Amino acid sequence: MIRISLDLMGGDFGPQVVIPGAAKALDRHPDISFVFYGLKEQCDPFLAKFPKLKEKSVFHDCELAVSMEEKPSQALRRGRYVSTMWRSIEAVKTGDADVAVSAGNTGALMAMAKFCLRTMANIERPAIAAIWPTLKGESIVLDVGATIGADAQQLMDFALMGGAMARALFEIERPTIGLLNVGVEEVKGQEEVKEAGRLLREANIDSLEYSGFVEGNDLGKGTVDVVVTEGFSGNIALKTAEGTAKQIAEYLRAAMSRTLLARIGYLFAKSAFDMLREKLDPSKVNGGVFLGLNGIVIKSHGGANAEGIAAAIEVGYDMAKNGLNQKIENDLKKYHAKRLPPIGPEAA
Amino acid sequence: MIRISLDLMGGDFGPQVVIPGAAKALDRHPDISFVFYGLKEQCDPFLAKFPKLKEKSVFHDCELAVSMEEKPSQALRRGRYVSTMWRSIEAVKTGDADVAVSAGNTGALMAMAKFCLRTMANIERPAIAAIWPTLKGESIVLDVGATIGADAQQLMDFALMGGAMARALFEIERPTIGLLNVGVEEVKGQEEVKEAGRLLREANIDSLEYSGFVEGNDLGKGTVDVVVTEGFSGNIALKTAEGTAKQIAEYLRAAMSRTLLARIGYLFAKSAFDMLREKLDPSKVNGGVFLGLNGIVIKSHGGANAEGIAAAIEVGYDMAKNGLNQKIENDLKKYHAKRLPPIGPEAA
């Protein structure tokens, strides 16, 4: 049984979408049990529609919900201990849940997760990892917005954590890792990226294979299993890709409705278009994973529909089932044991 | 007459593609005259095919061509004064051409352009501006790779230069400017971006309208006319968008060829698909503009076909015709005059 704590009030639509999303995930994975955190009055009407879900869940009525607009510091001040967001995270800390999922505001969720769960030993700053659809399947890209301006050692930590996540998610033994960089040779700056490359080469880690630098266009190609970058450029890459996909979908829609022949063609090719739409549907790949904390927290897109919420829950399910945090801890321990000489009488 | 100096040896295909590209541009703009720099033996067979082009151009035989793989420092050492790339830039300096165009390697072209033309007064570092196709038309995005890690004042300079380019290219009086940032509030780091925002608000510049921060997904929407960022994230955004467009084109191709019905649909909708392909064709929007130098240099994609080369030439044509560098100089002068109190007896 995988126990998932779910913030029912998160996202642009709250329980109206989060509850049907949970029902979808449960349909596909009957070994999920839920711990719900919500505002009772608002949730009850939707829960009533899913009796099977209601049976497989425990509901906790909370004092308040964090809004999508609140600043992290404000959310933390107002919502600590009492909000649906905080309490869903806390359930992971107390051991009442294996993973927490929320579609609430990213900054607040990260602030609360850091405050409540704290970072793992040897990890200075957490990262948000995104699952990126590629021509070869999927890659992991981190950090997409938790830390701005990581140094070489932090990029190294991201590589270790991303590698562990790839092993948990894709079931490959030695995922390939690339550092996101610009193609122009001999450019000034971004010394941290070059230095991280040196660290990765020299560390020669069993659990991952360092493939060198990759560029923005390698993301969609799926050149490597894990792409490592600091949060500013990672966030910009993620949102640029989402924006470009929407833009092209819009061009396509316009092209297909412009002439009668095109509309007829659309009807003939409808199943192909449905397949394409599925590929382009961001809700099919949803769920940013917070890495580096003492507990797994999944962030769903705020604008996700029920299918998107289900996808985020399923990412959490996979991560918990495959022992993501145990894998990360082991990898970090191995790396740091190699790196630091033993301290104490034996070392003398 | 707009005089364009063209490096015939640049790009993955050299004269075989650059010369037909020049012919296309000339067809569409009979008021172009060309100054060509190439290796005679390699260029003659292709030039012979375009008698009208040959008539409207002067050919200079050069000693050598810079390769696509050469490091900037190496290219500069070997190719200064004598290469086709250097000499096409130098023609702008000497006044023999209004603008230089090359599809050669970006790092080498930037290094030579900086060395030969030098930066404008008040500009510390040049930028590369890309023309970005959007749902509303086109935007300008800079810097896409010349400077890594710009400070607030450099971002301010980019805004002024991008604004001048928007006025030259789109013929709007007061283009809107956004600073590329991540959406999460209260994030640490990227103080330069916040500081640049403050500078832009306070400067209250006549020639541009500051619209605040934009995110990666605003690029494709066309939220503002000019998006300003430093070169690392700009380069990653550009290549991520290109990669995503290719990825979706590949999905589309696969979806349309999968079933017989889809293939029939494709035939019916072919003209719509052609329109879509046109929208997605990177060669239709080609030509990175080097800004901040005492002369205009246009960088074409190395992999551009003849249509792409023509597009880059036409960007140069537009920039020269609309007096881009004059506009930039005027805007910089106005800004710095407001900014610095007069020095001398009057100020006392």
UniProtKB/Swiss-Prot annotation, chains A, B:
It catalyses: a fatty acyl-[ACP] + phosphate = an acyl phosphate + holo-[ACP]. GO terms for molecular function: phosphate:acyl-[acyl carrier protein] acyltransferase activity. Its main location: cytoplasm. It comes from the Bacteria. Keywords: Cytoplasm, Lipid biosynthesis, Lipid metabolism, Phospholipid biosynthesis, Phospholipid metabolism, Transferase. The keyword Cytoplasm applies. Pathway: Lipid metabolism; phospholipid metabolism. One of its GO terms (biological process) is fatty acid biosynthetic process. One of its GO terms (cellular component) is cytoplasm. Its EC number is 2.3.1.274. It is found in: Cytoplasm. InterPro entries: FA_synthesis, Phospholipid_synth_PlsX-like. Pfam families: FA_synthesis (PF02504). Catalyzes the reversible formation of acyl-phosphate (acyl-PO(4)) from acyl-[acyl-carrier-protein] (acyl-ACP). This enzyme utilizes acyl-ACP as fatty acyl donor, but not acyl-CoA. HAMAP family: PlsX. Belongs to the PlsX family. Homodimer. Probably interacts with PlsY. This is Phosphate acyltransferase. It comes from Rhizobium etli (strain ATCC 51251 / DSM 11541 / JCM 21823 / NBRC 15573 / CFN 42). The gene is plsX.
